[in-house]
């Protein structure tokens, strides 16, 4: 089972799923040089359990791929997640962000509910990534625009 409702994500331990994080039509549309960093932790400021650095699709959306191993080892309970946008990011050879022009958090942190899997699978299962995105989370990305002295920039007021 996989479901997204507001900032709450529910997934069965060991399942695979795709979730699109889409820019709001009126906000900033990510470019090829931007990256989203999706992170799941036990609680805020605790150890990272899942971290994915994602390049945007051509339309500006980011697709988070939940692999089976991402959630299979997690105990059934609540975790916290957030997504941060690295604008004009520099990445290393592993695709991890090393520096960025700006880092923004476009939405409040959310809750990830991991539920216990009742049945067992025999053999390899199709991970379903050939399928369309299961759920969509629409977020307004706001890029900080300002002039050299901090005045409002041509694309909007200072954050």
Name every feature range the model reports, one short phrase each.
Residues 122-159:
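Collagen/collagen-like triple-helix sequence repeat recognition
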Residues 1-126:
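N-terminal assembly/attachment segments of tailed bacteriophage virion structural proteins
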């Amino acid at each position: 089972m996989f479901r997204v409702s507001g900032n709450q994500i529910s997934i069965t331990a060991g399942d695979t799923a795709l979730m699109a994080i889409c820019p709001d039509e009126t906000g900033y549309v990510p470019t090829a040089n931007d990256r989203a960093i999706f992170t799941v932790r036990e609680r805020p400021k605790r150890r990272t359990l899942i971290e994915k650095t994602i390049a945007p699709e051509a339309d500006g959306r980011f697709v988070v791929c939940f692999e089976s191993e991402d959630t299979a080892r997690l105990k059934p309970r609540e975790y916290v997640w957030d997504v941060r946008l690295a604008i004009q990011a520099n990445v290393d050879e592993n695709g991890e962000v090393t520096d960025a022009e700006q880092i923004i958090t476009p939405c409040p942190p959310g809750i990830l509910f991991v539920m216990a899997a009742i049945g067992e699978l025999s053999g390899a299962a199709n991970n379903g990534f050939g399928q369309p995105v299961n759920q969509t989370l629409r977020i307004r990305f706001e890029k900080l625009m300002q002039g050299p002295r901090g005045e409002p920039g041509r694309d909007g007021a200072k954050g």
